[in-house]
């Protein structure tokens, strides 16, 4: 860590161009350059199916891969080896996540919009969904819970989980236990853009799903966006890429807590980004010292150090300026560590998930508070929402008009049809209103 330099900068001393640069995501330019590579992979999977996915799996993950689908026997054998303490932790997280998402069940509604005209809003669970669980250097059973629990509550009939295997063709036992707990029906040993293609287009061992969920690297995020824009019919949840955390802290903040939170996101990957906004130079200096000291003790120090190179410690004029910067940046995670944290909430709406107060670490939301940790990144929190139960449903409308009800609206409908020059639209109304009602009179 002696070579690491984490500068502290005064926001007001930066030019407009410099301010924009300080808030630029490190992985954004790379994501743009990946479009063509991802398109080639997806085209290969679409044309060649399972054979293409197996080839990519051998190239990037398990060189000896012969099949993609995990059997129930393989899952059971792996789960049997899992430590009971880990099972209890997963069970606890499952319960809190289930409780919070169960409370989100959407309710059908029915309303009479005009005499004799009934309109309804109804919800139906998605039939088949795909859950992408990132692999690489970390085991992520928590992501399986975040995706699997709402799919289970919604009642999705087929839930396909994909995750890249290790060199031995295995997935972590903790991940498999979480998947089993959530009722995942199929598990495929593949990752990257090719896994998204397998979910969206279907392969021999696993038919296509209707919607793909889950975070991932730039390849995965780009692949999700591409399949959702072509004619596959597959939807995506939200753009969820490299992790981000922005902390707003004042003099009441504990620098050790702030640094620990920043590092908890920096250790996710070298393309993660963390930002501190504080009106206090003293807080900024103390947080920097804590970052240096705590990072040196991490098992993933090298990864966190790379992320810190693109991270920012910014001293602002006051809390109003901190709020304005946060709203512009629209972070995936926002931590408010001030003496009036809850009072700031109404002004801080552009974030995937907000962590209020000194005793709400971001890692709590990652694992077990109950909120979902699949969140919009890259500034998409301005317009996208965090993942929730409703994302696993289709919403559709129903309308029913009696003969008298149609007559109530006939003039409005036929006039608008005339305005738009759509004669058949008008005729579909008048052919009914000009005939006698066949409705029974009880």
From Swiss-Prot:
It is an enzyme of class 1 (oxidoreductase). SUPFAM superfamilies: ALDH-like. Zn(2+) binds at residues 265, 268, 366, 425. GO terms for biological process: L-histidine biosynthetic process. Pathway: Amino-acid biosynthesis; L-histidine biosynthesis; L-histidine from 5-phospho-alpha-D-ribose 1-diphosphate: step 9/9. NAD(+) binds at residues 132, 194, 217. CDD domains: Histidinol_dh. Substrate binds at residues 243, 265, 268, 333, 366, 420, 425. Keywords: Amino-acid biosynthesis, Histidine biosynthesis, Metal-binding, NAD, Oxidoreductase, Zinc. InterPro entries: Ald_DH/histidinol_DH, Histidinol_DH_CS, Histidinol_DH_monofunct, Hstdl_DH. The active site is at residues 332-333. GO terms for cellular component: cytosol. Its cofactor is Zn(2+). Binds 1 zinc ion per subunit. One of its GO terms (molecular function) is NAD binding. It catalyses: L-histidinol + 2 NAD(+) + H2O = L-histidine + 2 NADH + 3 H(+). Its EC number is 1.1.1.23. It comes from the Bacteria. Belongs to the histidinol dehydrogenase family. HAMAP family: HisD. Catalyzes the sequential NAD-dependent oxidations of L-histidinol to L-histidinaldehyde and then to L-histidine. PANTHER family: HISTIDINE BIOSYNTHESIS TRIFUNCTIONAL PROTEIN, HISTIDINOL DEHYDROGENASE HDH. This is Histidinol dehydrogenase. It comes from Idiomarina loihiensis (strain ATCC BAA-735 / DSM 15497 / L2-TR). The gene is hisD.
């Amino acid at each position: 860590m002696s070579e690491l330099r984490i500068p502290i900068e005064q926001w007001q001393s930066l030019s407009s161009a410099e301010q924009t640069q300080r808030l630029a995501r490190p992985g954004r330019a790379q994501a743009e350059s990946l479009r063509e590579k991802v398109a080639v992979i997806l085209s290969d999977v679409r044309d060649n199916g399972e054979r293409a996915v197996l080839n990519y799996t051998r190239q990037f993950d398990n060189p000896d891969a012969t099949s993609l689908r995990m059997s129930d026997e393989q899952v059971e054998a792996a789960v049997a080896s899992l430590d009971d303490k880990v099972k209890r932790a997963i069970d606890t997280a499952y319960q809190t996540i289930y409780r919070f998402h169960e409370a989100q069940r959407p309710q059908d509604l029915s309303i009479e919009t005009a005499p004799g005209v009934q309109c309804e809003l109804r919800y139906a669970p998605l039939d088949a969904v795909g859950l992408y669980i990132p692999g690489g250097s970390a085991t992520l059973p928590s992501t399986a819970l975040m995706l699997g629990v709402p799919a289970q509550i919604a009642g999705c009939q087929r839930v396909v989980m994909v995750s890249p295997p290790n060199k031995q063709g295995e997935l972590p036992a903790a991940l498999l236990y979480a998947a089993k707990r959530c009722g995942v029906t199929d598990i495929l040993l593949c990752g990257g853009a090719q896994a998204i293609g397998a979910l969206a287009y279907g392969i021999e061992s696993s038919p296509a799903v209707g919607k793909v969920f889950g975070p991932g690297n730039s390849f995965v995020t780009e692949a999700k966006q591409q399949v959702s824009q072509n004619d596959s019919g597959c939807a995506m949840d939200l753009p969820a890429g490299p992790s981000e955390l922005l902390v707003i802290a004042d003099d009441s903040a504990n620098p050790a807590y702030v640094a620990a939170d920043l590092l908890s996101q920096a250790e996710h990957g070298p393309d993660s980004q963390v930002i501190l906004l504080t009106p206090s130079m003293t807080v900024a200096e103390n947080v920097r010292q804590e970052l240096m000291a705590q990072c040196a003790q991490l098992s993933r120090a090298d990864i966190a150090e790379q992320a810190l190179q693109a991270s920012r410690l910014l001293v602002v004029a006051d809390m109003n300026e901190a709020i304005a910067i946060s709203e512009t940046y629209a972070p995936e995670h926002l931590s408010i560590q001030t003496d009036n944290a809850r009072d700031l909430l109404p002004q801080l709406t552009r974030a995937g998930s907000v962590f209020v107060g000194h005793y709400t670490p971001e890692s709590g939301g990652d694992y077990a508070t109950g909120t979902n940790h699949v969140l919009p990144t890259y500034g998409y929190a301005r317009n996208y929402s965090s993942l929730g139960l409703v994302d696993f449903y289709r919403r559709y409308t129903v309308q029913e008009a009696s003969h008298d009800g149609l007559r109530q609206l006939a003039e409005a409908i036929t006039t608008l049809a005339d305005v738009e020059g759509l004669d058949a639209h008008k005729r579909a109304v008048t052919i009914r209103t000009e005939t006698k009602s066949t409705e029974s009179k009880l």
